[in-house]
Amino acid sequence: MGEIGGEELVLDVDETIFVAVAEDVERSKTTVLWAARNFSGKKICLLYVHRTARAASWTHKKLVGGSFKKHDVKVIERVEKPKVDELMNSYLQLLSETEIQTDKLCIAGQNIEECIVELIARHKIKWLVMGAASDKHYSWKMTDLKSKKAIFVCKKAPDSCHIWFLCKGYLIFTRASNDDSNNRQTMPPLVQLDSDNETRKSEKLESSYMRRRLRYWRSLLEQDGEKDTGQLEREKVEPRAPPLFSSGSSSSFGEPVGPEPVSPELVDSDTLNTSNVEEKEREGDVARKVHRYDKAMHDIGQSDRTVYGEAGKKWEEDASTTEALCKAKALEGLCIKESSQRKRLEELLEKEKLEVKMVIEQNNGFMKELQMVQGRNLKLESQMRKLQDLEKEHGEKFDTAMELLKSFRQKRDEIRIDHENAVKEVNALRRLVKGETGESSGSEMLDYSFMEINEATNEFDPSWKLGEGKYGSVYKGNLQHLQVAVKMLPSYGSLNHFEFERRVEILSRVRHPNLVTLMGACPESRSLIYQYIPNGSLEDCFSSENNVPALSWESRIRIASEICSALLFLHSNIPCIIHGNLKPSKILLDSNLVTKINDYGISQLIPIDGLDKSDPHVDPHYFVSREMTLESDIYAFGIILLQLLTRRPVSGILRDVKCALENDNISAVLDNSAGDWPVARGKKLANVAIRCCKKNPMNRPDLAVVLRFIDRMKAPEVPSSETSSYANQNVPRRPPSHYLCPIFQEVMKDPLIAADGFTYEAEAIREWLANGHDTSPMTNLKMEDCNLIPNHALHLAIQDWQNQW
């Protein structure tokens, strides 16, 4: 065992509490803090045994005058001492906040417990605090020592040392010293007992006497060692007690001594080879003196144990008494605590009893309610069985009624067919009897059954669907060997059967070349049957996504004229018909690019509300008045006319055209794909469109005036000097194509609409029918009837056109 330091440490063991610490700070942290709390008036010295691999090779016998070369000692110190200093600084930092005087005693050795025992004996340590076991072994029942080191120190340490053994910061065991009764004055507060003054004086005298004897023998040994500074270490050294050295008194290791032989690795081979007989004799003298010193120290220890033996027994008795009193107080405290807990548990028990009583009462109430619910459940089950029987009975009746309904429908369809055939026969007989040739004032509309509609649309095959919107879905169909378009109206806001048939009858009488012909209806399914137009809509021509050839500017002006003519015809009808939802998708084009307006009069069959405010085709005044008027159709026509001129997105078209007109640069917005627009005509048409889109409906022009103006735009261009007004009476011009009779190719004087939807001169179509023709002069298809309807709107338009010239 060797001390880390070169000089011997002088300690005041009466005022110092020694605390044995481990290499791991966390393991000894609670022990150090416990000592700091309980011995605040004492000085604390940290006792640390540094276990190193070379400790076994160090000798436990002090070599006089430098047994190692100074170079070897410094080499060992440089390797081990920094580690020890770093560890001690960690412990001192832990105690720095307690304001307790601290010191450290560090030694190097192989066996930690033996080194601690030797330190106690060498320094006469009176008060020692050390661990009883690792923290993981702690329990509140723990009263015995678990650590082998603690057990060894408890058994082998001198009886003069009072030792406290702790675990996890709790005092586990106390080993009293045999001289506690003689050291009551210097005892720390934790173990101090009453003692008389004689005992304290005796303790001080004995302690000072032992210290003087120890210093005397050490001085003799050092004097002899100074004379033999050249002495070498022998191969075998006699065992002796290890010297103790202060950790901070020197910058080098102290001379290592101990019961184990010195390792040959630490002995300079050159020094051993130069040894001689004289040096061995002097070394023998020194060894004999050391042996005498050790024997004297042993005698001193024996005398100490004899002197303090009786005092130790008395102190043990006093300690036992004190411990018994402490246990009694602890038991008294436990009894009081147990009594309070018992009282609290009794209160909790009473509370639980009340709660159990309440739960039992609630349970009884629930049981009564359960019995009532079960009784009601039985009644409900019986009622449910009765309802199930009624449901079964009604189901059978319903099935029977459905079969009857199916048979009635079949009979109705048969009767309807018979009725239609009978009506045709009656009409034919009347014409034969009265000599009529188709001058009937009206036409009969055909009603179709739902079964016929279902069969015509292939049971509403999704692949046959042409489109779907807010106001119904449109399917393609084959009805009586003709291609038709079936529009299924929505069910909400539907009229009653009679009113629906009446209004459809009115729409069926409306015939115009630029209107899609309404061929029939199915009141049962609220569906309308129109003629099928296969060439798409005007919206397809405006869209850049479809590969549709662009319309020429001549075709666009003609289409605008046809739209205006059809609207004027609807507005002139009796009763007046408002389209209400005019937009490019509602304007169809046939194979000859002839305009066919669809969905006219839908607002009379279903309520049109909730129109989208973002739709530019909707009249802004509608959102104020919530009413569709003739001016609403004029506004929509103005927007469509602007689209025909520019083919621009409808969202900002009105603003763009106004800006171009203000800057006198209408050619910047005209659609170049239509060809070379006549700039003057384009500007005039744009002005007409802007007038149609006036915010105030009262400022919008009449459609008859607009139609006359657009028709004039279809004529060859005239010089600007001659176009100061709507017409120049002296300039010859060609009449619009729809003013000409398809048969005579002359301007019609009395236009009549035939069953094929075309308008003819009255004389021409009557002569055609009188010659026995039952097919259309235009399509060569068989006409449904020979009824003719006057086209008043077209007649008025022709008269206005003729009046201009």
UniProtKB/Swiss-Prot annotation:
Residues 226-239 have a biased composition (Basic and acidic residues). Residues 734-805 form the U-box domain. Its EC number is 2.3.2.27. Residues 181-205, 226-284 are annotated as: Disordered. It catalyses: S-ubiquitinyl-[E2 ubiquitin-conjugating enzyme]-L-cysteine + [acceptor protein]-L-lysine = [E2 ubiquitin-conjugating enzyme]-L-cysteine + N(6)-ubiquitinyl-[acceptor protein]-L-lysine. It comes from the Eukaryota. This is U-box domain-containing protein 32. It comes from Arabidopsis thaliana. The gene is PUB32.
